[in-house]
Amino acid sequence: MNSMEFPFLDRTTPNSVISTTLNDLSNWSRLSSLWPLLYGTSCCFIEFASLIGSRFDFDRYGLVPRSSPRQADLILTAGTVTMKMAPSLVRLYEQMPEPKYVIAMGACTITGGMFSTDSYSTVRGVDKLIPVDVYLPGCPPKPEAIIDAITKLRKKVSREIYEDRTESQQENRCFTTNHKFHLGRSTRAVNYDQGLLYQSTSTSEIPSEAFFKYKSSVSSHELVN
């Protein structure tokens, strides 16, 4: 056990009783029990086949892939996220129990990739929909890079204070109204227009076609520009 990561765990009494804080104990218990939900939409997702195999064996980190968001505390997004898929991703994130984490894997997930140059339906970065903890660039990232990202996330978990994380996730929650297309004079066929609507209800109570959620207070056109 690393005393640098958990300084309170190094205090022992003559009877060899460890004294610590509830926060450090909770973080330590979650280090080896991160259960990921694998969310893949394109080619980067194929790297998980190598990662799960015997050569890299990411089970040694306590990672157990789950098919239900209610059983997962980590979601790995890989591939391009379109406007049509964005509500589904937001809903999956909302259904995950706290504390929860996000790893954005690949150029398409982080920036929209090559599909973002002339596409009106590609989200320019998954961090406009959900908060991202670790960015993993690459096209596609190698399995070694994915393991490095998981290691960095584990270090973040070990230093985390749960109350601070909960407060930070409640800020800058923003939704958008229905999407509308308008004819423009540019060379492109249509211009994408969205209106903003601040709400306090959860996404599970709103129709999926009626909103998009992203992390910071950005203008609506930044989803696609």
Swiss-Prot record:
GO terms for cellular component: chloroplast thylakoid membrane; respiratory chain complex I. It is found in: Plastid, Chloroplast thylakoid membrane. Binds 1 [4Fe-4S] cluster. GO terms for biological process: aerobic respiration; electron transport coupled proton transport; photosynthesis, light reaction. [4Fe-4S] cluster binds at C43, C44, C108, C139. The keyword Iron applies. Its cofactor is [4Fe-4S] cluster. The keyword Iron applies. It is a peripheral membrane protein. Its EC number is 7.1.1.-. GO terms for molecular function: 4 iron, 4 sulfur cluster binding; iron ion binding; NADH dehydrogenase (ubiquinone) activity; quinone binding. Signal peptide: none annotated. Keywords: 4Fe-4S, Chloroplast, Iron, Iron-sulfur, Membrane, Metal-binding, NAD, NADP, Plastid, Plastoquinone, Quinone, Thylakoid, Translocase, Transport. It catalyses: a plastoquinone + NADH + (n+1) H(+)(in) = a plastoquinol + NAD(+) + n H(+)(out); a plastoquinone + NADPH + (n+1) H(+)(in) = a plastoquinol + NADP(+) + n H(+)(out). NDH shuttles electrons from NAD(P)H:plastoquinone, via FMN and iron-sulfur (Fe-S) centers, to quinones in the photosynthetic chain and possibly in a chloroplast respiratory chain. The immediate electron acceptor for the enzyme in this species is believed to be plastoquinone. Couples the redox reaction to proton translocation, and thus conserves the redox energy in a proton gradient. NDH is composed of at least 16 different subunits, 5 of which are encoded in the nucleus. HAMAP family: NDH1_NuoB (MF_01356). Belongs to the complex I 20 kDa subunit family. This is NAD(P)H-quinone oxidoreductase subunit K, chloroplastic.
